[in-house]
Each structure stands twice: as structure tokens, then as C-alpha cells.
A protein has these predicted regions:
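Aromatic- and acid-rich polysaccharide-binding/catalytic face
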Residues: 212, 376-399, 447
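Aromatic-lined carbohydrate-recognition surfaces of secreted/lumenal glycan-active proteins
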Residues: 176, 325-327, 349, 353-375, ...
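Substrate-binding cleft of extracellular glycoside hydrolase catalytic domains
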Residues: 215, 219-351, 358, 362
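Alpha-helical scaffolding within the catalytic cores
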Residues: 190-199, 232-235, 307-311, 370-381, ...
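C-terminal outer-membrane/trafficking sorting elements
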Residues: 504-565
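Substrate-binding cleft of secreted/luminal carbohydrate-active enzymes
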Residues: 177, 418-492
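Extracytoplasmic
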Residues: 21-168, 507
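N-terminal module-boundary/linker segments of secreted carbohydrate-active enzymes
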Residues: 135-215, 220-231, 431-433, 483-492
Length: 565
């Protein structure tokens, strides 16, 4: 009888499993110079050598519309990136790491019910493809910390982080980057800035998030009157924006910390213009990533960090919070901070954070780690150093795909524990595509229209208007106002039902203090470390130390400090 039950269970399990369907390259359509190569040791009779061409797998069948996992069996002599297209629309780019033997790379694609075409098209080209496998996608919920990484963050920063977390996966915050400040009058309404006005002119709505740059705040000319005025105007906009309920988002195009060159690009990316050859690794002790505090590089770096921190402290005094994306596009070989190894970059990022937060006392910023797709894991400074993981993606004009493959790559890289944002873009990702593809970015932010910028114009009026008037896109008009917004902490942002059981710490914990003391049935909200970082709903598996167990009793929050032996 037991054997029969086990057999039935096995049959039921097998019947519910989703098996991958394989599509061979030799049966696909090749174009642009790609060619078939007959060979042994592969899945079928050969493989496709794409060179500078493309491959299209026709007849890819999906039983129902939705998200599917796509595995590509490939070879590449060097790192390459190429486009993934589904039924003619761009689904994102795929990074193919160098490999001398056949290897797999996995991505996602949204398919329609019935027959589909999946294509790999040239961006860099020069890969070989044996086959692809397609199977239903297994989604996992996000579990994001209830508090920002900054210890003792300001009330404004906690509100901002909570707002991002509360809306992530449900709604996307609209943004716009600012460029030229010459048309903006110091102290005027931020809505009068040309880039902010651009959005209103196109859509009748203002962006909820406005990008600002410390572009002229460092370097040998930082104290020139025009440069200083540029930064002062950016700070003025941040103050007015926050007062109006919006979100300031800061980028820092950091110029040579030794003040030798008024540049942040390295020579190969300067297009004949001024460039810097500053090498921040000269600030390390030889053979390590430990800083030599007596080195010129270290002293120059720290002086610049302190200077930018002072602007944040000015905002902090006025109750203003913001988003900070330092050392952006990490791994891209065009800025001086990306010319060295991932380990060295991570040390630099940690220095920026530690100096600002622990030394200068900056407590009002939400921190962003912004790598290239290929470096998201290898350049990571550590999850305790950032709240948001973001990527910059510039699709072709009028390509409003969700870029789901990049979203899922970053979700997986963060183990579903970070807010994911599109921190720079050209055309906006259409809200319907984002929700259909389960790739709902926290915010998007087209680069500026001033300084002859073309990026906001890469979205047609109809798409601009339909998105900015969609309830799933947050505009400035939709913002609640920071004085009215209240923080609602829950253990995670998953779509699963919360645990309402009465949870107790494990038997190896000792209660130290409880505030306030309230009698009644308690429901565990979460376990937090002493810096307020959410760790889960049980102390099981946690190392020795002090933890805060947060419970809800009669509608009130009760915090108990436990020591785990």
C-alpha cells in the first residue's frame, strides 16, 4: 500500500513538472553572415557561428502567454553582449562570458500563447550557438529589508526608503534628469527648470523624481563662480522638490581627485576631449585594497568625498532626503573609477559610504549600486552598503520594452533582497510591458533634453501621455507629501500572505529588555539587527549577538531586545 501511494505521488509530481523544449540552431533561420557548421560533440548535427549575423528560432511554442526561462547553449572566445528579441521586439541584452567549451546562459522572455520567434541579434556578435531551451519561468517573491542600510537614518530618509519599498512591484516612479542650469534662476520653483518643464509640456504632468548632478562640484575648477552656481542651483532644486513632495536623485560625475584635469572620462572614452589618467589604485597599500592614508590619491579622494558630503549635510539640516548613486555605471570602461578590478572598485565604493555616513554623519541618503550588467556580482561592494540596485539602459528610439532580462538578472544577483531601478534610460519602458513581463522598475529616468539631449524625445507623445496618466506610474501630482506620509513597516514585499503565527525566539535566546510592555497575543513582525536591518521572522540560524524582535500586540509595535547565546 505504501509503495502504491509513493508511486501515485511520483506520477502526480511528474505530471506537474514543466520540462524544457529544445530548439536546435541548425533548424533556425540565419542572417547577416551567420552560418551553420557541421560538427560532432554538439546537441544535434552542428551549431551556428553567428560572427556578425543573427539567429532566429521560429516556431517556439508556448501553451499560455507569460514569462518563460530561456537557456542558450553557446561558446564565446571573449566576453560578448548581444540583443535578445522576441517576436521582433527587444527583450534586453544578454552577456556571454568567455568560455572555451560549451556553456549555458539563462535569461527570461515573455511569450504569447501559441507560436513565437526568439532571436539573438548582433550587438557585439561573435558567438556560437548550439541550441536554446525554453521552459516556464518560476517566479520568486522579493524580500526587502524594512529599513535603509544607513544606521540611524533621518526620519526623512526612512520615509523615502519606505515609500520606495511600499510601491516597488506595484507602481513605478516617473523621473527626469536635469542638465543645463543656465535657464533656471536660483531659488525659483523647480518646475521652471527646462528639463522638468519638458515633461509637463509633453504630458501635462510633472515627474515625481528629478535627477541632479554634482558635475561641476569637484575638479580643478570647482570653485569657479559658474561651476559653484551650477551646484548651488541643483541644491536649490532639491530643496524645493522635496518640499513639494518629490524625490531628488543625485549622480556624481566625479572629476580627477588630484585636480590635475577637469575630466572624469579616461582617454579611450574622451572622443578627443580632455581626459584624466588618475589611477585610484595608487591610494592602496601595495598588493592590497587597504587604503594608504598618506597617499596623494587617498587624500584627494577623501577631500572630494567630504566636499560632497557637506552638500548632503546642508540638505539634512533642512529635513531633505534623497537618492545617491555614486560611482555609477561600474564596470564600464569610460570613467576613472572603473578602470581597475571589481575588488578595487568595491573598496572605493565602501570608502565613499563609510566616509560620508560614519565620519561626516550623512544620514539622509538612500544608496544605489549601479553596475553594468556583466559586473553586477563581481563588483558588488556588499549588500550592507546600498539600498537599491540599478542599471542604465538606452534602447533604440521608440523601443518601449520592459528590459525584463536585465530586471531578472539584477533580481537574481541580489537574491530578491533589493529594490531594482532603471536609473538612466532613453525611451521609457511602457507600463503595460513592465507589468506583463513582471519587470516593474522602482523608477525610470530619461536623460536630459537640455544641452541638445535627444533622449526624452525618443518616446512619442502618445506613449508619454498614456504612461504618465496611468495609475501605475507615480507623478509629482500623485505624491502624498512628505509631511503627510507615514511609514508602514512590514517584513517583506512579497505577494505571499504574511506570517500571522505567534512566533517566539529560539531557546538559545535571552530577553534583555522590552518596550513598551503590553499584555495580549503577539504577532511577530520581524527580527532586526541592532542597526535596524530586517533579518527575517525567526532568530533560528542567526549568529551569536543582540537582536530586536519586533511584535504587534493589540495594534501596537513592541520591541524586545534578545541576546542569542
Amino acid at each position: 500500500m505504501i509503495k502504491r501511494k509513493n508511486f501515485i505521488i511520483l506520477i502526480l509530481a511528474l505530471s506537474s513538472m514543466a520540462f524544457a523544449t529544445k530548439y536546435e540552431a541548425e533548424a533556425a533561420t540565419l542572417s547577416g553572415g551567420a552560418k551553420n557548421v557541421n560538427a560532432s560533440g554538439v546537441s544535434g548535427t552542428g551549431y551556428a557561428d553567428l560572427q556578425e549575423g543573427n539567429i532566429s528560432f521560429n516556431g517556439v511554442t508556448a501553451e499560455s502567454a507569460g514569462k518563460y526561462q530561456v537557456t542558450i547553449h553557446y561558446k564565446a572566445g571573449d566576453f560578448k553582449a548581444n540583443y535578445l528579441k522576441v517576436n521582433g521586439a527587444t527583450a534586453g541584452t544578454i552577456d556571454f562570458n568567455a568560455t572555451t567549451s560549451w556553456a549555458d546562459v539563462t535569461t527570461v522572455a515573455t511569450l504569447k500563447a501559441g507560436t513565437n520567434t526568439i532571436s539573438i541579434e548582433k550587438y557585439w556578435g561573435w558567438i556560437s550557438v548550439d541550441y536554446i531551451e525554453v521552459e516556464p519561468y518560476q517566479s520568486s517573491p522579493f524580500k526587502i529589508s524594512a529599513t535603509p542600510v544607513t544606521p540611524n537614518a533621518t526620519e526623512s530618509a526612512i520615509k523615502l526608503y519606505s515609500f520606495l519599498r511600499e510601491n516597488f512591484g506595484k507602481k513605478t516612479i516617473s523621473g527626469m534628469m536635469t542638465g543645463d542650469m543656465s535657464g533656471y534662476t536660483m531659488g525659483a520653483d523647480f518646475k521652471t527648470h527646462d528639463d522638468v518643464k519638458y515633461t509637463f509640456t509633453r504630458t501635462g504632468k510633472y515627474p515625481a523624481l528629478v535627477g541632479l548632478d554634482f558635475l561641476f562640484a569637484s575638479g580643478p575648477k570647482a570653485n569657479d563662480s559658474w561651476n559653484k552656481e551650477y551646484t548651488d542651483k541643483a541644491i536649490s532644486i532639491a530643496k524645493g522638490l522635496w518640499k513639494a513632495g518629490g524625490i531628488p536623485a543625485f549622480t556624481w560625475h566625479w572629476k580627477d581627485p588630484l585636480d590635475k584635469k577637469d575630466a572624469f572620462y579616461i582617454q579611450s572614452a574622451a572622443n578627443g576631449g580632455e581626459y584624466t589618467d588618475f589611477d585610484f589604485s595608487t591610494g592602496f597599500k601595495p598588493g592590497t585594497t587597504e587604503w594608504n592614508t598618506e597617499s596623494a590619491a587617498y587624500k584627494g579622494i577623501v577631500a572630494d568625498i567630504d566636499h560632497i558630503a557637506d552638500y548632503f549635510l546642508e540638505l539634512q539640516k533642512e529635513g531633505v532626503a534623497g537618492i545617491f548613486r555614486p560611482l555609477h555605471e561600474a564596470g564600464g570602461k569610460w570613467f576613472w573609477w572603473s578602470i581597475n578590478s571589481g575588488e578595487q572598485f568595491a573598496a572605493l565604493y565602501r570608502l565613499v559610504y563609510d566616509r560620508m555616513v560614519k565620519v561626516k554623519g550623512v544620514k539622509n541618503m538612500i544608496w544605489v549600486y549601479n553596475p553594468e550588467g556583466s559586473t553586477v556580482t563581481s563588483w558588488d561592494p556588499g549588500s550592507e552598503y546600498y539600498d537599491v540596485l540599478s542599471i542604465d539602459i538606452y534602447n533604440s528610439a521608440n523601443d518601449h520594452s520592459s528590459n525584463a532580462s536585465a530586471f531578472d538578472k539584477f533580481k537574481n544577483a541580489s537574491k530578491s533582497t533589493k529594490i531594482i531601478a532603471l536609473s538612466e534610460n532613453g525611451p521609457i519602458p511602457d507600463v503595460n510591458n513592465m507589468h506583463n513581463d513582471e519587470a516593474v522598475w522602482s523608477w525610470w529616468m530619461p536623460w536630459y533634453s537640455t544641452w541638445s539631449g535627444t533622449w526624452p524625445g525618443q518616446t512619442k507623445d502618445g506613449v508619454w501621455k498614456s504612461n504618465m496618466n496611468d495609475e501605475r506610474i507615480i507623478t509629482l501630482e500623485d505624491m502624498p507629501g512628505w509631511d503627510k506620509y507615514t511609514v508602514n513597516i512590514s517584513p517583506d514585499t512579497s505577494t505571499t500572505k504574511p506570517d500571522t503565527s505567534i512566533s517566539k525566539p529560539d531557546t538559545n535566546t535571552i530577553s534583555i529588555a522590552t518596550m513598551p510592555r503590553i499584555a495580549g497575543i503577539a504577532t511577530t513582525v520581524g527580527i532586526f539587527d541592532m542597526n535596524g536591518h530586517y533579518l527575517g521572522i525567526t532568530t533560528q540560524g542567526l549568529p551569536q549577538g543582540r537582536y530586536v524582535v519586533r511584535k504587534k500586540v493589540q495594534g501596537r509595535i513592541v520591541n524586545t531586545v534578545y541576546f542569542k547565546k
